[in-house]
A protein has these predicted regions:
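N-terminal localization/anchoring segments of enzymes in phospholipid and broader phosphate metabolism
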Residues: 1-431, 449-453, 465-489, 493-497
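Hydrophobic alpha/beta core scaffold segments
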Residues: 456-460
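Active-site glycine- and acidic-residue-rich loops that bind
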Residues: 441
């Protein structure tokens, strides 16, 4: 309201807006609406995981016994959830797609001659785990493929509904979904799927509310090849404050560079029309040896990654997939080229996905480097990924890179203990931890011990944090916060001072 932006439902429309909503529905939405008549079905049809649905009870005011049940999936993916309506000067009025559909229910169901419509929103969450141990006779790719298909049939584990839903409809849905645990049935408000608000129209005009455009890192303002810049010095990029272009440019340059021999890179989540993959395909076409470790177990990206695997292999790229009981979440790139008959390695170590779209909203760091030790160790990781059956010898004795589950926790424990000893000697000691989540009880116990010894501990945790409250005297205090702002905090940084 302070910015004159109003979100209205179908009961708050003026005459002009009502006409607009009817026309918009007819032109933009109607062809995506598929009503499901459900009251006589032995079981519910396939319902998408986490999609919004309208549960509709239709009847006549004159006949309380004549009613029908229907479901409509809200087509947020194809239409978009936020519709800007005509407004008076200086105001912006927005209507949610589910409310626009509810307004047009008399048109959708006109042939039933009903005059009373009761519609409420709900969504289900299905069991999304892919059990890779079940099908012993299948290879890894077949297991992933079968798991994706089985996910469609996954049992609902959570049912969130608008708390004013018609009681008969609510009872009907709970029974048909096979839900019997109260903890799985959650009443809520009118608005669900708040993640869609990441795509809320940018209608606020004040400059303070507009995201700044990513700016070019000063090093890249020089009209030089990315390789030449990295040869001069390491470059740390901070997304989304810095533009993601240098990462794409580095791969594109390598694809066209006659002296480049190979490109090795890991991939977890990719953009739908990935410029990264396009650059790698171009490199393969130009005769470079391109190796991509593609994590097929990236939750909800399994299907997309399987498609990318097929595309890349058809272009001659070597695609490595899957280590049992492990996800490869590292973001690494090693490029090898010949410079004056000497092998030179350069690339990057990053916290972000190889995704130029999410790089605009995820706060991440990327170190572009030619550092011999780091690149040698990164290359050893790729050697392990390609030959993991032969054991982890190549990566056990790393000196600089910390790798989970090999040496990361033990290294952190040693560093925490070092801060404890410094604090015990009366010096200032501190640890700052910035992570997506922190649930490792062994590390948390070490941090409790550190704080008792006088180490100042600051935690910046975006998601889950299993920190215990303590009433012990002289136990010290761990300062823990979560940053919620314009960007999604995605970086992993730990500072021992």
């Amino acid at each position: 309201k302070a910015n004159k932006v109003l979100i209205v439902d179908n009961k708050q429309l003026n005459a002009e807006q009502k006409e607009f909503v009817k026309t918009y529905f007819d032109n933009e939405v109607r062809h995506d609406i598929i009503p499901l008549m459900i009251e006589n079905l032995p079981q519910l049809p396939y319902l998408r995981d986490k999609s919004l649905y309208l549960a509709i009870v239709m009847g006549n005011k004159t006949d309380a016994y004549q009613q029908k049940f229907a479901l409509i999936e809200v087509p947020s993916r194809s239409v978009g959830r936020f519709i800007i309506l005509p407004s008076k000067a200086g105001f912006t009025t927005i209507m949610l797609l589910e409310d626009l559909i509810e307004f047009n229910l008399p048109i959708i169901f006109s042939h039933f001659k009903f005059n009373q419509f009761d519609a409420h929103v709900f969504k289900i969450t299905k069991d999304a785990e892919i059990d890779l141990d079940q099908e012993v006779g299948l290879n890894f790719i077949d297991k992933i493929s079968k798991g994706i298909k089985n996910r469609r049939k996954g049992k609902p584990v959570r049912f969130v509904y608008e708390k004013d839903m018609n009681p008969e409809m609510l009872e009907f849905l709970i029974k048909k979904l096979g839900l019997n645990r109260k903890s799985s049935i959650i009443p809520g408000g009118h608005i669900h799927n708040f993640r869609h608000f990441m795509d809320f129209p940018n209608v606020i005009k004040e400059p303070n509310y507009n995201r700044p455009r990513p700016f070019i890192h000063p090093a890249f303002k020089k009209k030089m090849m990315v390789f030449d810049l990295i040869m001069q010095k390491d470059i740390m990029l901070h997304f989304p404050y810095h533009a993601y272009d240098p990462v794409i440019d580095m791969l594109r340059e390598a694809a066209m560079d006659d002296t480049v021999i190979s490109i090795k890179i890991t991939a977890y989540r990719l953009a739908s029309n990935s410029k990264v993959i396009n650059a790698l395909i171009n490199a393969a076409r130009n005769g470079k040896k391109v190796t991509v470790f593609l994590e097929l177990k990236a939750r909800f990206d399994e299907e997309a990654n399987l498609e990318w695997k097929t595309i890349m292999e058809e272009e001659g790229i070597t695609v490595l997939v899957g280590i049992p009981n492990m996800k490869v979440h590292a973001k690494l790139c090693v490029i090898q080229k010949k410079v004056k008959n000497k092998l030179v390695q350069y690339g990057f170590i990053s916290t972000g996905n190889l995704n130029e779209k999410t790089a605009k909203i995820y706060a991440d760091h990327c170190l572009m480097t030619k550092n011999v030790t780091l690149m040698n160790e990164a290359n050893r990781i790729f050697n392990y990924l390609g030959n993991w059956e032969q054991g982890d010898k190549p990566i056990v004795k790393m000196r600089n890179l910390l790798i989970s589950p090999i040496n990361m926790r033990s290294a952190f424990m040693d560093l925490i203990e070092k801060e404890i000893q410094i604090a015990k000697k009366g010096y200032v000691a501190s640890i700052t931890v910035k992570l997506n989540s922190l649930t490792d009880t062994i590390l948390l116990d070490a941090l409790y011990k550190a704080v008792k010894a006088g180490v100042k501990v600051n935690l910046i945790i975006r998601g889950i944090l299993t920190l215990k409250r303590t009433n012990e005297k002289n136990a010290g205090k761990i300062n823990a916060i979560s940053i919620v702002d314009q960007y999604l905090e995605h970086a992993r940084v730990i500072i021992f001072n």
